[in-house]
């Protein structure tokens, strides 16, 4: 990318660091991971969980959610000012599952947020350790990305539901900082901006006064984040137009939806990180592994190695397939919801199938579900190979932008073609090329038309054996070029809607 020099690496964002060398980054990411691990061990002690119960992913999610809620300052402030019946703003909790007499029981727990904050800080040498909190947010976001298809949200903001591959990180909270911004897809950023523009159209005071000034700063900051994700000059120039608009309205809305569509072929750079549940880090720390001393990276072999020797369990509903549940969590762990299934299958070493064919619902269990019939099983999260996570979008060098199937945002840096259905995508680009962005639009459409689905991306990049820690011998897989593999293709996954 052109602006490489000005960007901090994702690990630096992850750890709020200034410029650091590779060893320092590995150490500070390791420090963040061991903090999460220590916190998790302490919480399992507090809750008197057995080893098995502590490795249950549903318990992990509840504990993670509690600490995120305890540190959600804006929401905590709001809850104190707007008390609602039956909700104590100072407490947080959720369902904890325990094994009693051969059956799984649900127990609702409640803790003081202050107490949770104390335990978290204690596990992190007295720091607030925001990086660790963000890490857990990204894990939850990756799990949502693999579990739900955001068609309704796309339609609501006037975008095409087939653009779901652009929606990575769409459920990340606003407070997820630079590390969160790095993993957001083009569609997610566009959707956030469109929501602001719509509010501005409906509420004339939105951009006015002291509050309006803050709103404006937020708007421009989001525009700059989105601009930084685009890799072609024309797309970036259009973002400048959107950002500089005196009074954002319909023209900006049009430009943004145009840009979102263009990203299906001229893909943006979106970071991918393997963020694992706390119940993986806890036992690793407990077994004496020193993450800070050994160093850790979210984009290399480390998460793969960690998952190779971790035991994680999950509750299973009566008609769910444990192997399918495992696939869902594996994809979430590697942030691979929008990766080509051919690539994921090769790395995992077992066939990864589309969401619509999975006999499994989400990982979370609703409070009204019957526990009587609930079983549990081991999640198979191991892989056959490992590969480096990418943040490039996989555009080939000739055009700085290549073909992208209507549903892929690559996760792994592995050579393949990125197949896409040009007719479907180009059909969306009829007509409107007039107005102040006409020359940029024309240029973008020209680039899209010259993109070929058979172009090879990530030339020469391959996967590695798990014994090849230094990534010395890339194995370049050969894929059936004609066969696209998108996860949400023609699908009926549940909606993510709160």
Curated annotation (Swiss-Prot):
Keyword RNA-binding: yes
GO biological processes: symbiont entry into host cell; viral penetration into host nucleus
Keyword Transferase: no
Disordered: annotated span: 1-21
Post-translational events: Late in virus-infected cells, may be cleaved from a 56-kDa protein to a 53-kDa protein by a cellular caspase. This cleavage might be a marker for the onset of apoptosis in infected cells or have a specific function in virus host interaction.
Biased composition regions of type Basic and acidic residues, renumbered to the chain: 8-21
Assembly and interaction partners: Homomultimerizes to form the nucleocapsid. May bind host exportin-1/XPO1. Binds to viral genomic RNA. Protein-RNA contacts are mediated by a combination of electrostatic interactions between positively charged residues and the phosphate backbone and planar interactions between aromatic side chains and bases.
Stated name of the protein: Nucleoprotein
Organism: Influenza A virus (strain A/USA:Huston/AA/1945 H1N1)
Lineage: Viruses, Riboviria, Orthornavirae, Negarnaviricota, Polyploviricotina
Gene name as annotated: NP
């Amino acid at each position: 990318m052109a602006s490489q020099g000005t960007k901090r690496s994702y690990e630096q964002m992850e750890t709020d660091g200034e410029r650091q060398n590779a060893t320092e980054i590995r150490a500070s990411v390791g420090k963040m991971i061991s903090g999460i691990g220590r916190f998790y061990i302490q919480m399992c002690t507090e809750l008197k969980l057995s080893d098995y119960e502590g490795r249950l992913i549903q318990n992990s999610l509840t504990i993670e959610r509690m600490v995120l809620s305890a540190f959600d300052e804006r929401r905590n402030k709001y809850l104190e000012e707007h008390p609602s019946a039956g909700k104590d703003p100072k407490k947080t909790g959720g369902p904890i599952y325990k094994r009693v007499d051969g059956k799984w029981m649900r127990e609702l727990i409640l803790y003081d947020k202050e107490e949770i904050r104390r335990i978290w800080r204690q596990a992190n040498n007295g720091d607030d350790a925001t990086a660790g909190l963000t890490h857990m947010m990204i894990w939850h976001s990756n799990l949502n990305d693999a579990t739900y298809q955001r068609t309704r949200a796309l339609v609501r903001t006037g975008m095409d539901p087939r653009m779901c591959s652009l929606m990575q990180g769409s459920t990340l909270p606003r407070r997820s900082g630079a590390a969160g911004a790095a993993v957001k897809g083009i569609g997610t950023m566009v959707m956030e901006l469109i929501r602001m523009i719509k509010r501005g159209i409906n509420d004339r005071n939105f951009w006015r006064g002291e509050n309006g000034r803050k709103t404006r700063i937020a708007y421009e900051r989001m525009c700059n984040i989105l601009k930084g994700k685009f890799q072609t000059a024309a797309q970036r120039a259009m973002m400048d137009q959107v950002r500089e608009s005196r009074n954002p309205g319909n023209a900006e809305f049009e430009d943004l939806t145009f840009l979102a569509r263009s990203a299906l072929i001229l893909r943006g750079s979106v970071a991918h990180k393997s963020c694992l549940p706390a119940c993986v880090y806890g036992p690793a720390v407990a077994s004496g592994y020193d993450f800070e001393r050994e160093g850790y990276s979210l984009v290399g072999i480390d998460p793969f190695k960690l998952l190779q020797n971790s035991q994680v369990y999950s509750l299973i509903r009566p008609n769910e397939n444990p192997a399918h549940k495992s696939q869902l969590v594996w994809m979430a762990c590697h942030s691979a919801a929008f990766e080509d299934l051919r690539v994921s299958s090769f790395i995992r070493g077992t066939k990864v199938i589309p969401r619509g064919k999975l006999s499994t619902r989400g990982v979370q269990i609703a409070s009204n579900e019957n526990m009587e019939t609930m079983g549990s099983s081991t999640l198979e999260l191991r892989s056959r190979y490992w590969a480096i996570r990418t943040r490039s979008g996989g555009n080939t060098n000739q055009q700085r932008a290549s073909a992208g199937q209507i549903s892929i945002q690559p996760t792994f840096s592995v050579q393949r073609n990125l197949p896409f259905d040009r007719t479907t995508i180009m059909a969306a680009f009829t007509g409107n090329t007039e107005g102040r962005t006409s020359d940029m639009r024309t240029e973008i459409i020209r680039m899209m038309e010259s993109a070929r689905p058979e172009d090879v991306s990530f030339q020469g990049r391959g996967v590695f054996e798990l014994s090849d820690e230094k990534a010395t011998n890339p194995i370049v897989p050969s894929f059936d070029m004609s066969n696209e593999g998108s996860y949400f293709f023609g699908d009926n996954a549940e909606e993510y809607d709160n």
